[in-house]
């Protein structure tokens, strides 16, 4: 087993998430199991910062990270492929290109001016769509026009395009 890259200590959030602790090592897949209503989704959302946590500590590569919202989690390399892709994972009225580029603007438009490097964006989108074999006529089609499986591929590809350290999949 590799080094510990992700750790949650004593996470509490609402009535469903009580004293959750676990570690994930490099290359390891960790599952959170439980019956429907056991708090799996609530746990993932609290870790990602989509819902507030009352207490607990989150560590990435051995360093405590402060996650007050999804932007903090993304910056720390922790991302979420949510249970409801249409509601929480995609902007269905936007193109596949935009869905991949939007969460990666910090990588595509570095610097004070915030100008998107279109060549870098095109390369990122091309690699992401080819790696995941997203079936579509082109990257300009609305995400809503894709099949459910291809929509899910867009959700995952946008996060892997930024080389995230930890990807949380909620069902």
Regions found by a protein language model. Name each.
Residues 1-171:
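Glycine-rich phosphate-binding loops of nucleotide-dependent enzymes
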């Amino acid at each position: 087993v590799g080094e510990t890259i992700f750790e949650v200590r004593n996470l509490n959030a609402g009535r469903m998430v009580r004293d959750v602790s676990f570690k994930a090592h490099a290359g390891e897949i960790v599952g959170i199991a439980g019956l429907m209503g056991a708090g799996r989704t609530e746990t993932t959302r609290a870790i990602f910062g989509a819902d507030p946590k009352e207490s607990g500590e989150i560590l990435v590569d051995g360093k405590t990270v402060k996650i007050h919202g999804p932007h903090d989690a993304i910056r720390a390399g922790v991302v979420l492929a949510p249970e409801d892709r249409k509601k929480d994972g995609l902007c269905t009225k936007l193109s596949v290109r935009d869905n991949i580029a939007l969460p990666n603007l910090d990588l595509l438009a570095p610097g004070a001016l915030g100008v998107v490097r279109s060549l870098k964006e095109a390369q990122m989108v091309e690699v992401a769509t080819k790696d995941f074999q997203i079936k579509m006529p082109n990257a300009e089609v609305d995400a809503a026009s894709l099949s459910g499986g291809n929509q899910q591929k867009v959700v995952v590809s946008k996060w892997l395009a930024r080389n995230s350290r930890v990807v949380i999949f909620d069902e």
